[in-house]
Amino acid sequence: MAGAGGGNDIQWCFSQVKGAVDDDVAEADIISTVEFNHSGELLATGDKGGRVVIFQQEQENKIQSHSRGEYNVYSTFQSHEPEFDYLKSLEIEEKINKIRWLPQKNAAQFLLSTNDKTIKLWKISERDKRPEGYNLKEEDGRYRDPTTVTTLRVPVFRPMDLMVEASPRRIFANAHTYHINSISINSDYETYLSADDLRINLWHLEITDRSFNIVDIKPANMEELTEVITAAEFHPNSCNTFVYSSSKGTIRLCDMRASALCDRHSKLFEEPEDPSNRSFFSEIISSISDVKFSHSGRYMMTRDYLSVKVWDLNMENRPVETYQVHEYLRSKLCSLYENDCIFDKFECCWNGSDSVVMTGSYNNFFRMFDRNTKRDITLEASRENNKPRTVLKPRKVCASGKRKKDEISVDSLDFNKKILHTAWHPKENIIAVATTNNLYIFQDKVN
């Protein structure tokens, strides 16, 4: 399976798993987002309990190719607390919906995290020295009587154990009536967007009390509502361009230079529906759960319930590539509707060179598709393969008929085990995959 480096066949092997082994999972421990920073040295996860955990790549292991995929806890902090909206009598969950890193400009790191209503800018900084020798303070912290001070001394910095501090620098609140589903930092690194079901707002990172509404699809009469915004993202190179996807399977590309309110899109990406596949579930499964620009900015990838599509920004009428993630579930849509799995929101990601796309599935399976060779692979995040450098065996699902020895029947898939969140290191073949409450890290096998 090709990875960040290009067309060579890659064997993926187990590196680490984070999180408790218990079958009885606390709701607060369920991972809700996973994101590498721009260098890939840090990996952040958010959970339903409002916590953010940051892992750091082991520095000494970066040189040893077989241990590059080892990450250890760097910082843990409570990003959001549960709140109550007294005006609407609604509980606001603390669950972290999205995390986005800002590019590093100095020794500190910055990230944005959001729950349903409030976005926060966090500063993550290290301290390994502390000042000592104050004139009015004893070494044990007691204050001295100023009249007893006969000589002035210059405080000095003394080494101390490394301490990582997370401090909230900005809180962006009270701008969304509906639940925030996306945040995306602009390529100017000064502004970012936040999207909820019906509106998209543009913020400046320095200004918390004001945002600009750039998309508003709320109808005058809510009974006429036919679609909602499901995801939004800024173009990686063009700071005036962004896209947003809808529950009807369309993607709109907007140019902020055209007008202040981008209600009229510049481009509309939509694939005509195949009449032979039309069913009661067509509209539900065509809803887009994630949209991601390629690093180059030439393509974008969308994920709907059954497939991943890659679109060329210069061609609106159909995707240039379509990859079936779990087509064998088409015959199971009725039962997936009854158990609400049909509404699961799977995310997708690109590798560093845009040559491979990855997304999750059920039974703790995840899928990779090589855009050059058109080969695909299904792998499993499981504790059975948890010896370091154990090579992952490809898995196959048997849709019907006779099942071969290594195949899994579609009827025996566990729909409670699902991989919704995945992330790919921006420069190396290291991937992070979130199962319910565990974070798996895999890397390519180096001979």
UniProtKB/Swiss-Prot annotation:
WD repeat feature ranges: 11-80, 94-174, 175-218, 227-270, 288-325, 347-381, 414-446
Chain positions found as N-acetylalanine: 2
GO BP annotation list: protein dephosphorylation; regulation of chromosome segregation; response to morphine
Organism: Rattus norvegicus (Rat)
Protein family membership: Belongs to the phosphatase 2A regulatory subunit B family.
InterPro entries: PP2A_PR55 (IPR000009), PP2A_PR55_CS (IPR018067), WD40/YVTN_repeat-like_dom_sf (IPR015943), WD40_repeat_dom_sf (IPR036322), WD40_rpt (IPR001680)
Tissue specificity field: Brain.
Function: Substrate-recognition subunit of protein phosphatase 2A (PP2A) that plays a key role in cell cycle by controlling mitosis entry and exit. Involved in chromosome clustering during late mitosis by mediating dephosphorylation of MKI67. Essential for serine/threonine-protein phosphatase 2A-mediated dephosphorylation of WEE1, preventing its ubiquitin-mediated proteolysis, increasing WEE1 protein levels, and promoting the G2/M checkpoint.
Domain of life: Eukaryota
Comment, domains: Has an extended WD 2 repeat that is important for the interaction with PPP2R1A.
PROSITE patterns per UniProt: PR55_1 (PS01024), PR55_2 (PS01025)
Keywords linked to the UniProt accession: Acetylation, Repeat, WD repeat
GO MF annotation: an example: protein phosphatase 2A binding
Assembly and interaction partners: PP2A consists of a common heterodimeric core enzyme, composed of a 36 kDa catalytic subunit (subunit C) and a 65 kDa constant regulatory subunit (PR65 or subunit A), that associates with a variety of regulatory subunits. Proteins that associate with the core dimer include three families of regulatory subunits B (the R2/B/PR55/B55, R3/B''/PR72/PR130/PR59 and R5/B'/B56 families), the 48 kDa variable regulatory subunit, viral proteins, and cell signaling molecules. Interacts with the PP2A C catalytic subunit PPP2CA. Interacts with the PP2A A subunit PPP2R1A.
This protein's GO CC annotations: cytosol; glutamatergic synapse; protein phosphatase type 2A complex; synapse
The name this protein goes by in its record: Serine/threonine-protein phosphatase 2A 55 kDa regulatory subunit B alpha isoform
